[in-house]
């Protein structure tokens, strides 16, 4: 859609049509896609699906104004889960991204104002705004900390003691230690 016609298997036609409908209805202006991001402070990296400007749209009785969004695209039948907000808050709070020329740039240069997930199905699509505020960011950082402690956790249990000799065969038993 963005660069012209593309060939795709017939079984994906519904998904392609739904994606094109999303792009058209919200007048999506892609700023970046498949964007490599990183955060050295909290030691993580990832690939954000889409940074795009979206037209205003209705949501829960209000209008979300035109904004720059970080969007995660999902096609799973199961839909969108809370973990998607954690994924996107990590992307949004990254320190850097890799530009088109392979250069490292500050994430804030992208001007992301909102995060969302687009559930693309064969019969349509839904956009879910995501909460990527301080509570979500704090939760994400706790999970990152736990992940990085995994290696240390493996050292909590020492190696098995032994081998043990038959006590009757020992001439002088070792002195007990305190």
What do the predicted segments below correspond to?
Residues 1-45:
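Metal-dependent nuclease catalytic cores that hydrolyze phosphodiester bonds in DNA/RNA
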Residues 38, 51-55, 118-120:
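A generic structural motif
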Residues 38, 75-78, 122-123:
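Short acidic/polar capping segments at secondary-structure boundaries
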Residues 46-58, 62-77, 87-91:
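Conserved catalytic cores of phosphodiester-cleaving nucleases, focusing on short active-site segments
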Residues 79-83:
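Short alpha-helix boundary/capping segments
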Residues 94-178:
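Metal-dependent nuclease catalytic regions and adjoining charged, substrate-binding loops involved
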